[in-house]
Amino acid sequence: MFSLYNRFTTQGTLSDPDEVPDPRFALPSTVNWMRALSILVQDRGLNFGSASSFYAGTQRRVGTAQEENTIFEQLLFAVHQLSALEALRASPSKADVARVGIVGWYYGIYSAASAMIAAQDGSIQDDHTGTATTWDRQFAANNKVMAPFFYRLSTLVRKDFEVEVDTLRAGNGFLLTEKATDATEAFGACCSYLSGSADWWKWKTEQNLKSSREFKVLNVSDFRTKAARTLRDVRLTGKSTAFLHQAFRYRGKANYREALFLGYGKSTETLLDGYPDDLAIVLRGFVAMAGAFVAKRIGQPLWDEFLDDIERNRSFSLSPKTVWQ
């Protein structure tokens, strides 16, 4: 009997010539991380009010018109993505909207983080990795991020980041294989995804290193020699994993995984129960946090004018005042 699952996982495709990853194992962790974040956003009461209190000591910065416009542009992008996710929550089929939901979620996070960076120092980065690194350096590494978006690891050297994960867990052994039901389990799930993301970024960094001149000079194909390991660890040391790094990896689940993922299998719809809701709840929390920081940074009068203008002229259904007021 013809089966895409059997064909893909045993014969591979042109892009995955060996075999494609088995979606049965990847889908639960995808859903369970977002559920964990959703639980923690609600448990911590993350909204514009609590974020405004968190950023109460933030000093105002006077930027140029172009810097201010970049901030406003990125926030408009973010709230528009949130409006889309709120609309997706009403879909009777969660599998219909899961893939586009992930993409909308990521770009909402990315735009909100870009607005924070522009408000902080008047810059905008050229690529997603640069944005993730800059956001971590300016915010997460300096305790300027609220839970559950502040979990981070300071290195990609496995033996070192594993110690950091163990310290962060403090004995919480809950894994992503199960769906969290309370804040304690959700925290454990977030630790698991953070660890997995660090491992993924480690692998990605190693692959890039193998293409470098420094590695090719060693005339090796892996990191088994002492010289290769030393070169690798120098590259991995000081490279962090923070929330935007995790979000970047997460986006790839929608953009770059095989078609079986999210789109094949009779159990998929059941596994996705509540998933669009979780995407929207988490994005709303992050966008609220970003807006609260920006409001403090640009000052209340300009913030109110920005908010009123979107409210008058928005083409999408979500009122920004339900997020940022």
Q: What is the meaning of each model-derived region?
A:
Residues 1-325:
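Terminal alpha-helical segments
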